[in-house]
Amino acid sequence: MLEGTLQDCWTSISKMQLHWTVLGLLPVLFIAILGPRVRQIWVNYVHLTKIPSPHKKDYFCFVTETTRAEFLNECARLLRKGFASGDVIRLHASWDHIVVLSPSYAECLRADEKFSPDTFSDKEMFGAVPGFEPYRFLCTHRDLVRNVISMRLNRCFVPATRYLSEAIDDALRKQMGNDSEWREVPLGNAVLKILTQSSFRALQGPELCYDDEWLDIATQYIVTSVTGVTALRKLPKFLVPLIHWFHPDAIKSRRLLSRARAKLIPFYEKRKKELYQARRNGTYRPEDADAFGWYEELADGRDYDPVVAQLTVAVAATHSTTDFMCQFLSDMVRYPEYIQPLRDELILALKEKGWKASTILQLPLLDSVMKESQRLKPVAMGFMRSIAQHDVYLQDAVKIPKNASVIVSAHSMRDATVYENPDSFDGYRFINPTKHPESRHFTSVSVNHMGFGFGKHACPGRFFVNLETKILIAHLLLKYDWKFANDGCPAIRTSGFDQVVDPSAKMLVRRRKEEIRIEALYE
């Protein structure tokens, strides 16, 4: 018995020795596995900090909010200060250090595979946070999203011209009314609901486009998730993985995503069966389908979340477009001398050519006025957002380390060497093809007008947005008058690079007697 007891004791001691040996090896394993990664992070940080920064000196920026608050609240000033002395600067954003390049580098980046836009939105929009999955979907399924937009959505213009108009007409009646007396409306909320309904008509068909419950879920998700992202940017990055579990906007986003899932899954299953039968019978036509079918078709068996996919396109199609429309409406109140010429151009085109996509898309003055509105107040101060996939050396020997966040400043949109009187609104600026031939159309992109991005970073949905916003503007020009409420011109809210019209702004609208009825022109 004693022998057995000693043997058990020795076995226990041996196990303890083994455990201590393993514990002793842990630091070695830690250094071996994580050491190179930690070293690379440090090396990248050293190279990044060599790039000049316009921030105030703050040696405790890791634990204080000085530089982060400066970026969020004073980004425009930082950009002016930084580019006054160089073409490459570094800003301390809320989520990372960002290398900001002068517009002169846009041509170099437009097709450079060393810079990838895939993971930038995931990092900037906190795609890893539960409830914000649509922002990660843009990263993980970027090719699928681009194909759905460029190969399907952008090719449905002929039928879309009528059904978008019908959806917009219905939404306008609900949001702005038919009263000839002035009526106060919440500008951002009204425009968002109008554009959500019209976009969903193209993306999800008539059933969901006129479903008030679904429209409410979707618009709430867009507003709540964007608000949540903006709020989380104000926090130190290391706190986000914890705080989001308790943040009200993140919690609400998760609940809305669950409601969206319950609402959309039955429609997805139905469309999936219809697609299977149509392809089996050889009767499938992409132009007769919607985004449920397009995703399923182009995914070609690849795994994806159909609900997140729908919300991804919804956010992409409506958030920045809503801001543009709010700015356009504000500009038309500030510069009312363009209203009647725009109406005259539209009425003449409709009388001569009827209600067709080609008619709506060929309105030179409207293109120019929209382009000018976007030039003076784009949705962001920088575009072509990307992540360096390798160490990159710029022409002036500046090193951008691998995994660094990179963005191109859009300050050339107000450059006096490019535009005459750059701070003045000139609605006829782009109508002259000899002055700015590369920017005649609202959808055209260039180094000096990156309202939709540039190169491979350009927004693939801008052609659909062009049609949709012009249809909405046509209805507004013919059917409504609008002016500022007592609060006056809506303020511009900034958060880092983003600059949007105050979503709480109010506007007064009233119905007018149109010179020509759009509905009478439908073919």
Swiss-Prot record:
Q: Name one GO biological process term.
A: secondary metabolic process
- Keyword field contains Transmembrane helix: yes
User: Cross-referenced SUPFAM superfamilies, in alphabetical order?
Assistant: Cytochrome P450 (SSF48264)
Superkingdom of origin: Eukaryota
Task: State the PROSITE patterns in the record.
Answer: CYTOCHROME_P450
Cofactor(s) listed: heme
Recorded hits in Pfam families, A to Z, give: p450
Q: What is its main location?
A: membrane
Q: Name one GO molecular function term.
A: monooxygenase activity
Q: Where does the chain cross the membrane?
A: 16-36
Which top EC class is given? oxidoreductase
Q: Could you tell me the membrane topology recorded for this protein?
A: Single-pass membrane protein
UniProt xrefs under InterPro entries = Cyt_P450, Cyt_P450_CS, Cyt_P450_E_grp-IV, Cyt_P450_sf
The residues that hold heme are 459
List the glycosylation sites: 178, 281, 403
**Metabolic or biological pathway:** Mycotoxin biosynthesis
EC assignment: 1.-.-.-
Q: Which CDD domains match?
A: CYP503A1-like (cd11041)
Localization recorded for this chain is: Membrane
* UniProt keyword list: Glycoprotein, Heme, Iron, Membrane, Metal-binding, Monooxygenase, Oxidoreductase, Transmembrane, Transmembrane helix
- Which family is this sequence assigned to? Belongs to the cytochrome P450 family.
Function comment: Cytochrome P450 monooxygenase; part of the gene cluster that mediates the biosynthesis of the diterpene glucoside brassicicene C. In the first step of the brassicicene C biosynthesis, the bifunctional diterpene synthase bsc8 that possesses both prenyl transferase and terpene cyclase activity, converts isopentenyl diphosphate and dimethylallyl diphosphate into geranylgeranyl diphosphate (GGDP) that is further converted into fusicocca-2,10(14)-diene, the first precursor for brassicicene C.
- This one is known as Cytochrome P450 monooxygenase bsc5
